[in-house]
Amino acid sequence: MDALEKGAVTSGPAPRGRPSRGRPPKLQRSRGAGRGLEKPPHLAALVLARGGSKGIPLKNIKRLAGVPLIGWVLRAALDAGVFQSVWVSTDHDEIENVAKQFGAQVHRRSSETSKDSSTSLDAIVEFLNYHNEVDIVGNIQATSPCLHPTDLQKVAEMIREEGYDSVFSVVRRHQFRWSEIQKGVREVTEPLNLNPAKRPRRQDWDGELYENGSFYFAKRHLIEMGYLQGGKMAYYEMRAEHSVDIDVDIDWPIAEQRVLRFGYFGKEKLKEIKLLVCNIDGCLTNGHIYVSGDQKEIISYDVKDAIGISLLKKSGIEVRLISERACSKQTLSALKLDCKTEVSVSDKLATVDEWRKEMGLCWKEVAYLGNEVSDEECLKRVGLSAVPADACSGAQKAVGYICKCSGGRGAIREFAEHIFLLIEKVNNSCQK
């Protein structure tokens, strides 16, 4: 992270004694429009994602819970519906491609603002220099994957309706702070925010507010003065479970578990999965075919995947297998998975559609695990899709979840666990 992303949010102290800029923003005329037509100030979401991350190489597009890291915040920003434009500022081709796949526009960051010494403010000012239409910038941190559209909607309202010049995100923490011991300077520690003789209980103390770095919104005039926090300021308090930041490797597994339980998965309301269709070759198996001396076909699969299938079935999810290859009856029988299977399939989408109708399901209740070009249409159509880690690039682009495991090496079990977590989210949302 650069200086701002680590919390140094200005190049100097915020202006003091400056008159409050609390007046609602003036409406601006649409450029190129006829007289009398007005529009609100242009609010742009801007995600800074350079390719030279030192903590975790290319972390901005590393898969978190099967989704490129940057994808989580882009999904939230686009679905919030409050931005006139959503941008990613980057100097890297791969990050640019991922950003466009999620529907964001791309600003190619210059080498001058892509250095290790460059600050977020440098990159934001550069962006504004190229985009005169932008009046307000919502700088959203790529490393905050639990961000929800509702957070952004409320902040946009604070800026547009309540007249704030800048709003930044905070989280409430109940942590006692102590001074640092420095040899030759301070030999003992002292409490900074408590009286040890009267230690408060958590429920008796409001705690303190800390910046969590999730986002910084500021008006153009403030940014051009060199600040992201100033003028009429306000904080936006995020829920603790949504306050996640990824900086080093140790943060990754913690963030992954948090995002699976508290992350934003899109506008579509999650439905409980009732049917999982899995491609045999390259998903259930590793795609290798062995031929014995007597010309018999031999394939193998991971016991973990068999257990995953069993767990799915016990939870009430039908599991069916599909293949475009002509697998022999002996081979299918030897699998001993007790799943309905269709082989020699030339049109997988038609077959899955037939199964769906047979079970009286909508597409949102169907999950699909595939790995080949022939699986792409199914992957795009179903409610929940995934591919093994070694799937072809076309299939990877068509899905929302990419397994860490390869085909025939635990991908089904991993996807099953993912399905169970999503079912838990559905049940929790219903209870609420």
Curated annotation (Swiss-Prot):
Catalysed reactions, semicolon-separated: an N-acylneuraminate + CTP = a CMP-N-acyl-beta-neuraminate + diphosphate
Xref: Gene3D superfamilies: HAD superfamily/HAD-like, Spore Coat Polysaccharide Biosynthesis Protein SpsA, Chain A
Region (Disordered) residue spans: 1-38
Compartment(s) where it occurs, according to its Swiss-Prot or TrEMBL record: Nucleus
Residues recorded with modification Omega-N-methylarginine: R35, R50
UniProt keyword Metal-binding, yes or no: no
EC numbers: 2.7.7.43
Catalytic residues as annotated in Swiss-Prot or TrEMBL: R199
Binding of substrate, residues: R50, N60, R109, S118, S120, Q141
Tissue expression pattern: Highly expressed in brain and heart, and at intermediate level muscle and liver.
Annotated keywords: Acetylation, Methylation, Nucleotidyltransferase, Nucleus, Transferase
Membrane-traversing stretches: none
List of residues that carry N-acetylmethionine: M1
Primary enzyme class: transferase
UniProt motif BC3 motif: location: 267-274
Pathway: Amino-sugar metabolism; N-acetylneuraminate metabolism
InterPro entries in the cross-refs: CMP-NeuNAc_synthase (IPR050793), Cytidylyl_trans (IPR003329), HAD-like_sf (IPR036412), HAD_sf (IPR023214), Nucleotide-diphossugar_trans (IPR029044)
GO terms, biological process: CMP-N-acetylneuraminate biosynthetic process; N-acetylneuraminate metabolic process
One GO MF term attached to the UniProt entry: N-acylneuraminate cytidylyltransferase activity
Family the UniProt entry places it in: Belongs to the CMP-NeuNAc synthase family.
Domain notes: The BC2 (basic cluster 2) motif is necessary and sufficient for the nuclear localization and contains the catalytic active site. The localization in the nucleus is however not required for the enzyme activity.
Subunit relationships: Homotetramer; the active enzyme is formed by a dimer of dimers.
PANTHER family per the UniProt record, alphabetical: HAD SUPERFAMILY MEMBERS CMAS AND KDSC (PTHR21485), N-ACYLNEURAMINATE CYTIDYLYLTRANSFERASE (PTHR21485:SF3)
Protein known as: N-acylneuraminate cytidylyltransferase
Organism: Mus musculus
Originating gene: Cmas
